[in-house]
């Protein structure tokens, strides 16, 4: 990091989703409804962050929100955030919010210099700052199990009982 962006961000997957898909499966969103921002307790204390509260993660390319997850399972002055998108925003007046509100990839580079071996952009070791988001969750984001009711399956007809 540096003085303006003193924390190192790494990103990666969580086991609930395959790459960027399946965010519209209500059962999976109940398990992992929003992206967590994992950080060491000393990092959280240093920046005035409480476990479970909403935080901003910001660098010169933009800022995104996630929920703080304070854990000893990550190095000090490092945070981890999983890429995320919110399909519930696709049917709104601003569908771009689906991929801009909580998607850590907003903070990555979109122009060279890319990884010379793979030709990909950098997903690890991004300098950021992290701080409380007093405004809380993004407006309209589905974060509670009852929010996912519109996506629950509806049965069109009864299923015949074939085993008794």
Describe the residue ranges of each PLM region.
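Long, low-complexity segments enriched in small/aliphatic residues
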Residues: 1-25
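Long, contiguous, secondary-structure-rich segments that constitute the structural scaffold
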Residues: 22-38, 42-164
